[in-house]
UniProtKB/Swiss-Prot annotation:
InterPro entries: PROPPIN, WD40/YVTN_repeat-like_dom_sf, WD40_repeat_dom_sf, WD40_rpt. Residues 262-308 are annotated as: Disordered. GO terms for biological process: autophagy; protein transport. SUPFAM superfamilies: WD40 repeat-like. It is a peripheral membrane protein. The N-terminus might form a beta-propeller domain involved in specific binding to phosphatidylinositol 3,5-bisphosphate (PIP2), leading to the association of the protein to the membrane. The L/FRRG motif is essential for the cytoplasm to vacuole transport (Cvt) pathway, for the recruitment of atg8 and atg16 to the PAS in nutrient-rich medium, and for its recruitment to and dissociation from the PAS under starvation conditions. A motif (L/FRRG motif) lies at residues 226-230. This is Autophagy-related protein 18. Keywords: Autophagy, Endosome, Membrane, Protein transport, Repeat, Transport, Vacuole, WD repeat. SMART domains: WD40. Its main location: membrane. It is found in: Preautophagosomal structure membrane; Vacuole membrane; Endosome membrane. WD repeats lie at residues 1-36, 69-114, 139-182, 185-225, 230-269, 309-355, 367-407.
Amino acid sequence: MAMNFVTFNQDYSYLAVATSKGFRIFTTDPFAKSYETKEGNIAIIEMLFSTSLVALILSPRRLQITNTKRQSTICELTFPTTVLAVKLNRKRLVIVLEDQIYLYDIQTMKLLYTIQTSPNPNAICALSPSSDNCYLAYPLPQKAPPSSFNPPSHTPPGSTHVSPTSGEVLIFDTLKLEAINVIEAHRSPLACITLNSDGTLLATASDKGTIIRVFSVPDGHKLYQFRRGSMPSRIFSMSFNTTSTLLCVSSSTETIHLFKLSHPTSSPDASPSSPVGRDRSLSQSSSGYSPDRGDLTGDVGSSDFPARKHNGTLMGMIRRTSQNVGSTVAAKVGGYLPKGVSEMWEPTRDFAWFKLPKPNQTSGGSVNNGPLRSVVAMSSNTPQVMVVTSDGNFYVFSIDLSKGGEGTLTKQYSVLESNDRLGYSVTDY
């Protein structure tokens, strides 16, 4: 039996696992099997909070909405191409195809809107769990190349050249059915994005994986910038805790990072002389964009963003930056430099971290020669981080919220074994 897909529900109280022989649902605290079916090769599974409604992808183009309590099918939908991702909240059902996103009213299953996107084979997309701030985030569609565009010489004859995914994020209001902002998050293509439970914060990572950024939603102010590491790494999963004070990040390395989102003491209209005010004054524009004008902290593309009228001229940016002189030494020095250079003086590293155990080659998971993939979430009841890996293991790590530092593995289970209560506790309290 192979594990095809794994995900937490919106409040991290349940874990859903899709396999080649049905699917399983577990409670996370305490860890126990809640539901299981052994029929069907399930490609994708998504839950709606703690309800009995489950969305399943049974074949590449077919979606089934199921009531697990009644063991009945609510509806089935077939799409023109392969379904790459499914997102749910109490108002909307989102279906992500490679170049389209379908929005449904989850109460009536009526199709409300179809969004045309640039090719998005990795299904980079995030839907807020909030019914009030019901925002959808996805890569900004790229304009078609001009008629004079020449594809690379290595492109096969007759094929269509596809540009890399944008580093910009489009914020779409799924209640008003309109795009409301674009956030220029990275110069490199996006690799992972996530929204917090209130739909007020957006975390982004590019395909370099060295810098994690957090923006306010929907206005797009850059609030935090974190360094995961200096070497490139593929970001697999990012998750805010329920109070949005911590951000957990997993990648193709074995280290899981936790970053602290300390609330700024200054007001949103802070003076540009303060570090917070300086960041915000340079990250917002009249259109709500958040330009990335010089990321020299490890997430650097081959060139700057194309010049845009609302961003102003380069000399204008330098003049504005040179006027942002703070009271501290770092602020004084950084104020005379372009924003990307000044950010090198203020790197924000992880607050806590821990390393995953080495993959168990004898487990029933779909382990290959590539890096161990992982999905992370934080418990809403205890200071613990939950991690599910592609080899079928579920880990629980305890963290010290006051001191941070290295976390401790306390529990380990398998999501692929047949027992109702699985695994063992690493430490017996």
